[in-house]
Amino acid sequence: MARVCKVTGKRPMVGNNVSHANNKTKRRFLPNLQYRRFWVESENRWVRMRVSNAALRTIDKVGIDAVLADLRARGEI
């Protein structure tokens, strides 16, 4: 399963672990994804999405209806 946020598109990033001796090994920085249910009043149903915490803040700010409209316009749901 892809670790991708439905709303923001955040994905894992690649970086390095750096030891005290300055040795570098590859690592992944994973987005903080959560499965959340959102009540959509206009459709009278729950919508379950995998979203990042940044997306939760966006949904709080603009509303779930606006976010779903944007996702539908992009053709993602």
UniProtKB/Swiss-Prot annotation:
GO terms for molecular function: structural constituent of ribosome. One of its GO terms (cellular component) is cytosolic large ribosomal subunit. GO terms for biological process: translation. It comes from the Bacteria. Belongs to the bacterial ribosomal protein bL28 family. NCBIfam families: L28 (TIGR00009). This is Large ribosomal subunit protein bL28. The gene is rpmB.
